[in-house]
Each structure stands twice: as structure tokens, then as C-alpha cells.
A protein has these predicted regions:
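Alpha-helical segment proximal to the catalytic Tyr-Lys
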Residues: 370, 414-415, 484
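Substrate-binding pocket helix/loop in short-chain dehydrogenase/reductase
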Residues: 340-342, 346-351
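Glycine-rich flexible loops
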Residues: 1-257, 269
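Active-site helix of classical SDR
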Residues: 365, 401, 409
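Residue(s) in the substrate-gating loop at a strand-loop-helix junction
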Residues: 385
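Short C-terminal tail/terminal secondary-structure segment
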Residues: 336-339, 483, 487-501
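Short, small/polar-rich loop/turn modules that mediate ligand/substrate recognition or access, typified
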Residues: 417, 422, 486-488
């Protein structure tokens, strides 16, 4: 039994009822509902399942014998700065940060390289239900978009016109931003505020690409009319499907963050807080355990030696290639190798401390800047130390390195403000749940002040214990819109230190 398209829900139920009443439905193995799908039935579950397999297999065999998918090869290399620019434009049109997940599979690039792509990709969705996820059509992007990615604004304008053509009294227009793109020669892009949303759109795009091409070879790809798709897009039951989407009020929803020194302490806590606030978080650390640690707190861990410029460059590019850009960079990786005096300190300790704490911070910032220029609320947070202002004996290399990154951040704030990138410093002190504070390091520090370890832990003015979690929360707040007008700031989180004050 084959029935023409009608709206889903009660109208569809009534259509099927009217068609089958008065005759034996068992003479059919199933029902094909145009633009909905195939339905099989029986009083026996196994028989209904076997009927489905039979009908689908017949369709697969016919398509295999008669359908053709055009295989177009593309040798294009993706310009990641263009991808970041596209993401920023889409985020602006939607009014919130969006991920931009690019499918560069051979099949996706081949589809995007077709000569007729602007026509076949702009007719409508595979099934009208997809419209709530993908909108009616994707935006078609040039292989090398202009500086403003004008195709995005054109899409927005056309969506507004589409709404005006089809609206009825009482309807309020949904946001006009695209949810998917066909990027000429480069593949397809899914836009969303979560990885889950992007994955759903990517799956839909994958099925749609194949079906469009097979449909064209079998007589022509013909979706529903614009009006029929509009009616489903603005159908109250369809909108209810999206009503409970997670993360709408999260401070960093849809943002992309990189945190160094993420395998423990402040870095790990920062990753956990940012992820809880909706960000996609990539934690870097030389410790291989970073993968397991980040998985537990909702992020992705990557092994990286931040003193290796090639590794840093490669990983930043990889993050942008996967998620579409970069919004937050937290420079936390650091080391405190010993408590020796200047006289006793080895050259190796000095060189390693400066290399990890200062030079590596400069280089990761340098590698991140091109992408942060296209970030949404772009922010760099540098983790300094109380030692920048109040150094201690036996901590010369560490104190110099933290004074250095503080000056580096101040200069970066001056240089990057015209690009809308905020740069701020947080100065923690006595955060004892970090790897820096080994038992040996605590004993040495306490000895310098002629006090016990317990006394040393509580020697700040407020007499409070500073936890990594609280530093992470400060990082999250400072990189959020709450501090949209703050750059070049230095914020202590140390319980109060009389030498600093």
C-alpha cells in the first residue's frame, strides 16, 4: 500500500485509517508513506520484522542495480583559518557560540565538489522531520569564502524571507542561522552548541548526500514543497522535541577551550569547571594519564610536551580541524623543580623551569592567536603565582618565570585588544592539592619560614584553604562574558598575602 504525504501525527493516522478500513490489511506486507518511510506489521513480531527486511532488501537490490552515486574526487586542502572564520560568522548569526564540525571524508568532499551542488543540495531535506535539526537547506559555501563569509548573511536573509512567505498569525521566527553547510570541495559542516547536536546533523547529512545522488540517477531528487516543510518546522510537536536541549544557560556552551597542565591540580579542576559550563575542553599534558583524567571530568586529554613547538602547533591545528575554532586558552602548565638557593641551583633546573613556565607559555599563545582572532568571546588566562610579586628564597627560577609570564600576559593584553582577545592573569598561592606541592617541597618551604608544614598551609591572612576547584571556577568566570570588559587584569586567589598587599 502506497500513500501520499500528509503531516505526521493525527492527520497521518486518520489517512491510514481511511485507506485501510473495509478491507483485509493482511493482503499487504507493509505501507510506504511518501517522505515518511516504510511501515510493516503483523500479529507476530518476527513476521513484521521479516516483512521489513524483505521490503528493504528489494529496495536495496533495485538501487544497487539502477542507482548511481557520482564519485567526484577533491584534492583540496582545508584552510583552518577559513573554517574558524566560518564558525565565527555562524555563531554571530545564531547569537551564541557554535561548534563547526567538518566532515572531510572522501564521500563528503566528493559530494561538495559536484558541479550541480548548489542545485541538488538546496531543494530540501531527505525527510521533513529533519528540518528541526538541519533547517530546510544547508548554506552553500565557496571553497575560499570572503573575509565576511557573505554566504552566511545571505542564508540568514533568505531564511527570513522564507519565514515571511509562509508564516501565519501567531508564529515567531526561529533563529535564522544555518545548521549545516556544504563547503565547496572541502566537505560538509555541522553547526551546533554541543558535540551531540553536531553528530546528529553529520549523520543526517551523510544519509542525505547518498540519497540525493541516488535519487538524481533514478529520475530526479524531489523533496517536499517549501510550504510543506515550513509547516513541519513550525509544528508545535516538532518544536517540543528540541525544548529540552541541554546547556542553553551554560556560560561556555558551544565554546572550545584548551588547557595546559591538565593531568591534575588546577589544570584538571579548570577542565572540569569549563566542561560543566558547556565548553568542549581539550586538556594537554606530558603525563599520558591525561587521557583518563580528562575523560572522567568531561573533556578530551591529549599528550603534549608544551616545550615542543611542533607538538603544540600540531595539536592546536587538530583541535580546530575537529571542532572549528578556539575560544579559550588556559596556560597552566608549570613546574617547580627544587628549593635550592641561587648558589646551589644547577643550570638544568634554571633552564627547564624557564622553558616550561615561560617560553612554552609564549609559544602556545603565539600558535593560538591566529585562531583566537576568530574566537567567540576569545580569552587567554595565564596562571601566574604569588611569587611574581612576593618571591621566596630558594625559588629564584620559579619566581622569575612567573614574573615573566605576568609581563608576557600584560604585553599580550595590549597587543590583542584590537582583535577582541582578552588576556588576564590569575595568581594562586598555597594550592596544596597540586603536583607542585610534593611532601618534600612542603617541608622545604616550611623550613624556610621556621614553621611546621601545617602552619605553612594556613598562613594566609584569611586563614582559608585555597583549593584547585576554586581556582578553576575563577578561570571560568574570568573567561566568561561576566568579564567581557576586563583585560590585562591580575587577580590573586591566595587568601590574602601581606607581602603582596
Amino acid at each position: 500500500l502506497i500513500l501520499p504525504y500528509v503531516m505526521p501525527g493525527f492527520i497521518l493516522s486518520k489517512q491510514v485509517y481511511n485507506e485501510i478500513k473495509g478491507f483485509d490489511i493482511n493482503q499487504y506486507k507493509g505501507i510506504i508513506l511518501h517522505h515518511h518511510g516504510v511501515f510493516t506489521y503483523s500479529n507476530n513480531a518476527r513476521e513484521a520484522y521479516e516483512n521489513m527486511i524483505e521490503l528493504v532488501t528489494r529496495a536495496e537490490s533495485y538501487i544497487s542495480e539502477n542507482g548511481v552515486v557520482q564519485h567526484v574526487e577533491s584534492q583540496s586542502e582545508v584552510n583552518l583559518l577559513d573554517l574558524a572564520r566560518i564558525r565565527k560568522s555562524v555563531s554571530a548569526s545564531r547569537g551564541s557560540a557554535q561548534l563547526a564540525m567538518l566532515d572531510q571524508s572522501d564521500e563528503a568532499k566528493g559530494f561538495a565538489s559536484r558541479d550541480d551542488i548548489a542545485d541538488i543540495a538546496s531543494r530540501g531535506p531527505l525527510t521533513p522531520d529533519h528540518v528541526t535539526r538541519t533547517k530546510r537547506i544547508p548554506v552553500i559555501l565557496d571553497a575560499k569564502p570572503d573575509e565576511n563569509v557573505s554566504e552566511i548573511q545571505s542564508f540568514v536573509n533568505e531564511y527570513k524571507a522564507y519565514f515571511e512567505r509562509n508564516k501565519v498569525d501567531g508564529l515567531i521566527m526561529l533563529d535564522p542561522a544555518p545548521r549545516a553547510a556544504v563547503w565547496s570541495s572541502n566537505g560538509t559542516i555541522a553547526f551546533g552548541s554541543t558535540v551531540k547536536e553536531c553528530n546528529i546533523i553529520t549523520d543526517i547529512a551523510r544519509h542525505t548526500r547518498w540519497t540525493i545522488q541516488v535519487g538524481e540517477s533514478l529520475g530526479g531528487w524531489k523533496p517536499l514543497s517549501e510550504r510543506e516543510i515550513f509547516d513541519l518546522e513550525y509544528w508545535v510537536l516538532q518544536q517540543a522535541k528540541l525544548a529540552n536541549d541541554e546547556g542553553k544557560d551554560n556560560a561556555h556552551q558551544g565554546k572550545i577551550a584548551i588547557v595546559t597542565g591538565a593531568a591534575g591540580g588546577i589544570g584538571c579542576a579548570t577542565c572540569e569547571v569549563l566542561a560543566a559550563e558547556g565548553a568542549v575542553v581539550i586538556g594537554l599534558d606530558i603525563d599520558p594519564d591525561v587521557k583518563n583524567v580528562l575523560k572522567e571530568v568531561g573533556g578530551t586529554g591529549m599528550i603534549c610536551d608544551v616545550t615542543d613547538d611542533n607538538q603544540v602547533h600540531k595539536i592546536i591545528d587538530e583541535v580546530v580541524a575537529i571542532y572549528g575554532g578556539l575560544d579559550i586558552l588556559v596556560c597552566n602548565a608549570g613546574t617547580f623543580l627544587s628549593g635550592e638557593s641561587i648558589e646551589e641551583m644547577t643550570n638544568k633546573i634554571w633552564d627547564n623551569t624557564i622553558s616550561i613556565n615561560l617560553t612554552a607559555t609564549c609559544r602556545i599563545i603565539k600558535n593560538a592567536i591566529p585562531y583566537l582572532k576568530f574566537g567567540v568571546g576569545a580569552s587567554i588566562i595565564v596562571i601566574g603565582s604569588r611569587n611574581y610579586a612576593a618571591p621566596g628564597a630558594g625559588a629564584s627560577a620559579y619566581s622569575v618565570s612567573k614574573a615573566g609570564v605576568t609581563q608576557l600576559a600584560r604585553v599580550a593584553a595590549l597587543e590583542l585588544a584590537p582583535d577582541g582577545i582578552r588576556v588576564n592573569v590569575i595568581h594562586p598561592d598555597a594550592v596544596f592539592d597540586t603536583k607542585l606541592w610534593t611532601k618534600k617541597a612542603l617541608q622545604k618551604s616550611a623550613k624556610r619560614y621556621n614553621i611546621t608544614v601545617d602552619e605553612y598551609k594556613n598562613k594566609n591572612l584569611l586563614g582559608v584553604e585555597v583549593k584547585s576547584q576554586k581556582v578553576g571556577e575563577m578561570v571560568s568566570a574570568l573567561s566568561s562574558d561576566l568579564f567581557y570588559a576586563t583585560t590585562g587584569a591580575q587577580i590573586p586567589i591566595d587568601g590574602g598575602n601581606d607581602r603582596v598587599i
